[in-house]
């Protein structure tokens, strides 16, 4: 729709990171669509469209994009994947004791559903004006490059590492069309992982920069609160 505000879709809108990203993008003029297991199909108090989504079922993802096109008459130019899953192996002394069903379910959330979302994003981007900034942003962590000896991160790390690869490959092959893909990873100033001390507003500010293609930030977008993009080697 000519003249309409761009649309940002946040898949996995939690109370800390997801809500901060939504707020930051809304302040940039985006129409916001949020999804979670508790989506209502109506508008939130903030004025965001809210849809229900089960990220353990990748086949359900296209219906979210269809609903957006039906309601807003356009496709999202920014898609943020902020959902994650981690199941602890029942035997802490055997990381491979996790049942296959649990492994598959978590892999769906961490890798397969975001892949399907990226497919849908690209299909939608092809219909948008050429000068519209188009970005797919995945909330990552250090597990794509660092193996921590903690059984709890088995499925989380597997999913992050797998997703980082296809995100990097997608960015390399679609960038010429103006389609950007980012693996966003908040770090401490010394490059160590922030762990559970993630900062919602810092994510919101940085994701808004990524959405607008500000600076020449690579697909592996490591960032520090108060500084923005910082490269760590």
How would you label these PLM feature ranges?
Residues 28-43:
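Conserved glycine-rich Rossmann-like NAD(P)H-binding loop of the short-chain dehydrogenase/reductase
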Residues 85, 94-119, 126-172, 191-192:
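Catalytic loop of short-chain dehydrogenase/reductase
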Residues 45-60:
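Rossmann-fold cofactor-recognition segment
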Residues 168, 172, 176-233:
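C-terminal helical subdomain
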Residues 80-92:
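Conserved NAD(P)H cofactor-binding loop of Rossmann-fold oxidoreductase domains
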Residues 10-11, 81-82, 132-141, 180-185:
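Structural signature of the Rossmann-like NAD(P)-dependent dehydrogenase/reductase core
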Residues 11-24:
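N-terminal Rossmann NAD(P)H-binding glycine-rich loop of SDR-like oxidoreductase domains
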Residues 56-75:
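Conserved Rossmann-fold cofactor-binding substructure of NAD(P)-dependent oxidoreductases
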